[in-house]
C-alpha cells in the first residue's frame, strides 16, 4: 500500500505529488446520465452541487461489456492470494462460513476451469483498453456508489468514496449515503483534488452519530 515492492513486478515505483489547493476548474468530470436518473436524490444533488461549484461536467458512456460475467476472475485471484489458508484447512477457523463468505469463495474458485479464466481475462483486457480510451478524454467521473465497483476492480482505476448526505430507512433509521469519484490510472492527485473540493464545500464528513 505504500511504496514499491521489488519482488512484485506488477507494482510501479511512481511519485505521488498532490497539491490540495490546486485549481479544480480545469478538471473535466464525466458522469453516466442514466445512472443518475434513478430515484436517489442525494446522487442527483451531488451533480447539482458540482455544477454550482463551476466544474465542467460532461455526459459519458461506460464500455458496454458484460462485466458481471467476469466477476469470478476476482474470486480466483483472491483464492490464489489465500491459497495457503485453504490448503492448510485454516479457512475452517474463520467464523463466517455462509455460502458467499470468503472461505467458500476460495473453495469454489478452485473449481473454475482454466480455459474459462483465460477467456475471461481476454475480455478483461478489452474492457481495460476501452476504459483507458474513455479516461483519456476526462480527468475523472462521478458514479453512484457500487455502480462501478466491479468494473474498476477489473480495470484498476482508483476510486474515492465520499459521503453525500443522509436518508431515512424503512425502520426510520437515518443512515449516511455516498458517492464515488473514479480517476485515471496513476491520476490520484486530480481525483483527490476534486474529492477534497466537494467534501470541503458539503461538509457531510463532519456529521457524526450521536452517542
Please name every model-derived segment:
Residues 55-72, 106:
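Short connector loops at secondary-structure junctions
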Residues 1-44, 202-211:
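A short helix-breaking turn/cap at a secondary-structure junction
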Residues 1, 84, 111-211:
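Glycine-rich, small-residue loops and helix-cap segments
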Residues 23-32, 72-125, 163, 170-179:
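Short helix-loop capping/hinge segments that flank enzyme active sites or metal/cofactor-binding pockets
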Residues 31, 59, 142-143:
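Structural recognition of the beta-strand scaffold that forms the well-ordered cores
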Residues 6-12, 54-63, 92-96, 206-210:
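Flexible, glycine/charged-enriched surface loops at secondary-structure junctions
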Residues 35-37, 65, 147-149:
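Solvent-exposed loop/turn segments at secondary-structure junctions
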Residues 17, 38-61, 82-93, 117, ...:
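Acyltransferase
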Amino acid at each position: 500500500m505504500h511504496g514499491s515492492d521489488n519482488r512484485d513486478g506488477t507494482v510501479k515505483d511512481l511519485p505521488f505529488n498532490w497539491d490540495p489547493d490546486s485549481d479544480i476548474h480545469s478538471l473535466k468530470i464525466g458522469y453516466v446520465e442514466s445512472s443518475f436518473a434513478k430515484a436517489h436524490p442525494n446522487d442527483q444533488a451531488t451533480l447539482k452541487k458540482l455544477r454550482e461549484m463551476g466544474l465542467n461536467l460532461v455526459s459519458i458512456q461506460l464500455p458496454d461489456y458484460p462485466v458481471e460475467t467476469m466477476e469470478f476472475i476476482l474470486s480466483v485471484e483472491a483464492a490464489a492470494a489465500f491459497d495457503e489458508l485453504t490448503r492448510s484447512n485454516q479457512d475452517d477457523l474463520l467464523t463466517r462460513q455462509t455460502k458467499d463468505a470468503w472461505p467458500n469463495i476460495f473453495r469454489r474458485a478452485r473449481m473454475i476451469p482454466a480455459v474459462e479464466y483465460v477467456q475471461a481475462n481476454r475480455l478483461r483486457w478489452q474492457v481495460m483498453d476501452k476504459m483507458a480510451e474513455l479516461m483519456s478524454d476526462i480527468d475523472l467521473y462521478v458514479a453512484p456508489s457500487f455502480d462501478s465497483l466491479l468494473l474498476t476492480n477489473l480495470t484498476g482505476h482508483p476510486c474515492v468514496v465520499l459521503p453525500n448526505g443522509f436518508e431515512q430507512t424503512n425502520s426510520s433509521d437515518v443512515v449516511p449515503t455516498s458517492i464515488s469519484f473514479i480517476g485515471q490510472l496513476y491520476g490520484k492527485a486530480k481525483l483527490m483534488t476534486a474529492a477534497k473540493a466537494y467534501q470541503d464545500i458539503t461538509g457531510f464528513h463532519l456529521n457524526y452519530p450521536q452517542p
